């Protein structure tokens, strides 16, 4: 009799274990939320975007925004492109 029961349990195991696992998981999930309770989210005074704007304003307050590097000076410090390594330099 035991071999017949083991064969039946082996054959129908997916049909038995999935609903059991689903019920155990659902009960555990609900029990965990019941014990833990709903989390209280802290209310932020400013959004991240507002904080970023404030930080950039504070950084630019001490700088003179009219003094900028010219493009010619800026291009001298840029590295040469990888694709132009094997080309001959123009004289």
UniProtKB/Swiss-Prot annotation:
Keywords, ordered alphabetically: Membrane, Transmembrane, Transmembrane helix
Q: Does the keyword Glycosyltransferase apply?
A: no
Superkingdom in the source lineage: Eukaryota
Membrane topology annotation: Single-pass membrane protein
Coarsely, its chief localization is membrane
From the Swiss-Prot or TrEMBL record, state where the protein is found.
Answer: Membrane
Q: What is this protein called?
A: Small integral membrane protein 12-B
Q: Which organism is it from?
A: Xenopus laevis (African clawed frog)
């Amino acid at each position: 009799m035991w071999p017949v029961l083991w064969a039946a349990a082996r054959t129908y195991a997916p049909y038995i274990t999935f609903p059991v696992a689903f019920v155990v998981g659902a009960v555990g999930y609900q029990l965990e939320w019941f014990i833990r309770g709903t989390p209280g989210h802290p209310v932020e005074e400013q959004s991240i975007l507002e904080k970023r704007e404030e930080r950039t304003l504070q950084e630019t307050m001490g700088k003179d925004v009219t003094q900028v590097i010219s493009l010619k000076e800026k291009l001298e410090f840029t590295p040469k492109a990888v694709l132009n390594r094997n080309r001959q330099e123009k004289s």
